[in-house]
């Protein structure tokens, strides 16, 4: 992708990880994060060995968050700490695209990626091109994605609101603190 790798690196990194996640889901759904070492019975009790391959992205991202090393995805690359530059920001971007894909449905992310690549072959593209392209494909509001997920390091912290107990089910509201 022909874009400014100092400021918009997260787009190409996110596309790369997102595509890897989709590939693994489709062609290797049984693969584990630790690979064939997961087959050894002596290691079965360790949670890390039992994680699916794509769960490693969440694992490493959460490792960064728990150590309070999270940085916004739109932070210039030269301002990132080494762990974020090499690992966690890429995973966060890929997970964010995967989350957005689930939210938008209708194959919007894969289609937008193809169009973004085509656009980048003609000119240098930027975040605004990517944002405009995504917003043109849906009627859903995407400001939350760019303002909260990309531009800030605000953590998503859900809290249960009102809980209604019925005969055979529970109804509840969730809100982000």
For each feature predicted by the language model, list its residue ranges:
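Hydrophobic alpha-helical and helix-loop surface patches within well-folded domains
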Residues: 1-176
